[in-house]
A protein has these predicted regions:
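Mature catalytic domains of secreted/periplasmic carbohydrate-active enzymes
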Residues: 1-346
């Protein structure tokens, strides 16, 4: 268990009444789905992390996309950053996805609008590195703005909406100084405040878009807790703006422990005891959060036990599912989700 997830427990007593009521509503949801889907869905590595030179764990010898490039990080990074040019998920059916999640018994959906690699799964005006960009063959599809299409389908199906957003962005030029080498040459917020201010504005513009153009948003799920402190994106200002646009918004500023971590998010493990905080355990269906062909998956019975354990201890359970690069939910995942729903109804 990552210690930083629990190190900043604040409880709910110091929160305003409206937020305490919203958190009670959130706790009533019990079970949700988190979707990791992006250009990384093409390859057999995990999402985003293989771009980082120091993250050897993410580029194991059995990972084909790594060995095919002679374990050359520059070659790997270059090809990764061009994956969007072949991203054409024509099998994407947002209504089918939403109905499947309802059948599984889920009450809310958290979608990766942007992971650490910086690829945007919505029609942002801040960058061309997006699914609606002209270099992406899917940009002419009626559902090219997959975030909008999915959230609309979710709401029609009665599902609450959670926006996953990475505070880190390993593609944005304002996040790096001087070259885009993830995690090793981040713009210095003290020595280069002008560049960092551009990144802060970039981030705020993206959050404003997501809070303005995508209907009712219930939860803002902010990842990349390691950027706390030295990489100040003026969280108070950003959250105030988001809540002005989305009244009642719940914010999970993950693993930071500030006043904007409305609930804590233990990852890959369920706490042994009830926590003083509102919490949500997030665990993937298989070893990876994203789609990896033929990876071992938990059984439906195992997942139901995890859901019930989390709920019994006072927490929500967020199940990680990885859609395929073609826009479909894998058959094995679909079968397990349907069986989860059957087991929980009996």
């Amino acid at each position: 268990m990552r210690e930083d997830v629990f190190a900043h427990s604040t409880g709910t007593g110091d929160k305003p009444e409206w937020l305490r009521e919203r958190l009670k509503w959130f706790q009533s949801l019990k079970f949700g789905i988190i979707l990791h889907w992006g250009v990384y869905s093409f390859w057999d590595c995990c999402e985003s992390w293989p771009l980082v030179p120091d993250c050897d764990w993410s580029r194991r010898d059995e990972i084909r996309c790594w060995t095919e490039r002679n374990k050359d990080i520059d070659w790997f990074q270059r090809d990764y950053r061009n994956l969007h040019k072949q991203f054409n998920p024509t099998g994407f059916d947002p209504d089918q996805w939403a109905n499947l999640f309802v059948e599984a018994g889920a009450k809310y959906v958290c979608f990766t609008t942007k992971h650490h690699d910086g690829f945007c799964m919505w029609d942002t005006e801040t960058t061309d590195y997006k699914i609606t960009g002209e270099e992406c063959p899917f940009h002419t599809n009626p559902n090219a703005d997959v975030t909008k299409a999915l959230f609309e389908s979710c709401r029609r199906a009665g599902l609450a909406v959670s926006v996953y957003f990475s505070k880190a962005d390993w593609h944005c030029p304002y996040y790096w100084s001087p070259e885009p080498r993830p995690m090793s040459q981040t713009a210095n917020t003290v020595d280069d405040p002008e560049t960092w201010e551009k990144f802060v504005q970039y981030t705020h513009r993206q959050i404003r878009e997501l809070m303005t153009n995508y209907g009712k948003v219930d939860i803002l799920w902010l990842d990349a807790g390691w950027v706390r402190g030295k990489e100040d994106i003026r969280m108070a200002e950003m959250v105030a703006m988001a809540r002005e646009l989305q009244p009642g918004l719940i914010v999970a500023n993950r693993a930071v422990g500030d006043e904007f971590e409305d609930f804590v998010t233990p990852e890959r493990e369920i706490p042994d005891d009830q926590l003083p905080d509102v919490w949500e355990a997030c665990l993937p269906l298989g070893p990876d959060w994203k789609y990896v062909e033929n990876q071992p998956l938990k059984s439906a019975a195992q997942v139901v036990e995890e859901i019930e354990t989390a709920n019994r201890r006072g927490g929500n359970f967020l199940l990680g599912i990885g859609p395929k690069y073609d826009g479909t939910i894998p058959d094995r995942d679909t079968e397990i989700l349907l069986e989860i729903g059957r087991l929980r109804r009996n």
